[in-house]
């Protein structure tokens, strides 16, 4: 029992020091979400509720669509349907 308490305490201590909030220097930007591949299919427009563009720090540009089911789907910003969806979302 004493060993379990010691191991659990040690694991909690390690987890606290490995926390992303503690490992980043103060004032630094949060981790950036990047896309490494795009969806091969056009999403149904009624599934998409929001979008954002990936950071310029990413290796390739992307538009990330948020779906009604809270999924995030990476899309190629040069595709015409992606540009149409972004335009439509900006208007609404």
Swiss-Prot record:
Swiss-Prot/TrEMBL GO biological process terms: antimicrobial humoral immune response mediated by antimicrobial peptide; cell adhesion; cell-cell signaling; chemokine-mediated signaling pathway; eosinophil chemotaxis; establishment or maintenance of cell polarity; immune response; inflammatory response
Quote the Pfam families the UniProt record gives.
Answer: IL8
What does induction of this protein depend on? By mitogens.
Molecular function GO labels: CCR chemokine receptor binding; CCR1 chemokine receptor binding; CCR5 chemokine receptor binding; chemokine activity; cytokine activity; identical protein binding
GO cellular component terms attached to this protein's record: extracellular region; extracellular space
Explain the post-translational modification: N-terminal processed form MIP-1-beta(3-69) is produced by proteolytic cleavage after secretion from peripheral blood lymphocytes.
Question: Does the keyword Cytoplasm belong to this entry?
Answer: no
- Cite the CDD domains for this sequence: Chemokine_CC
Q: Using the chain's own numbering, where are the disulfide bonds?
A: 34-58, 35-74
This protein's major location comes to secreted
Give the keywords, sorted. Chemotaxis, Cytokine, Disulfide bond, Inflammatory response, Secreted, Signal
The residues forming the signal peptide are: 1-23
Q: Which InterPro entries match?
A: Chemokine_b/g/d, Chemokine_CC_CS, Chemokine_IL8-like_dom, Interleukin_8-like_sf
The subcellular localization recorded is: Secreted
What the protein does comes down to:
Monokine with inflammatory and chemokinetic properties. Binds to CCR5. One of the major HIV-suppressive factors produced by CD8+ T-cells. Recombinant MIP-1-beta induces a dose-dependent inhibition of different strains of HIV-1, HIV-2, and simian immunodeficiency virus (SIV). The processed form MIP-1-beta(3-69) retains the abilities to induce down-modulation of surface expression of the chemokine receptor CCR5 and to inhibit the CCR5-mediated entry of HIV-1 in T-cells. MIP-1-beta(3-69) is also a ligand for CCR1 and CCR2 isoform B.
Tell me how this protein assembles: Homodimer and heterodimer of MIP-1-alpha(4-69) and MIP-1-beta(3-69).
Family to which the UniProt record says this protein belongs: Belongs to the intercrine beta (chemokine CC) family.
Name used for this protein in its record: C-C motif chemokine 4
Encoding gene per record: CCL4
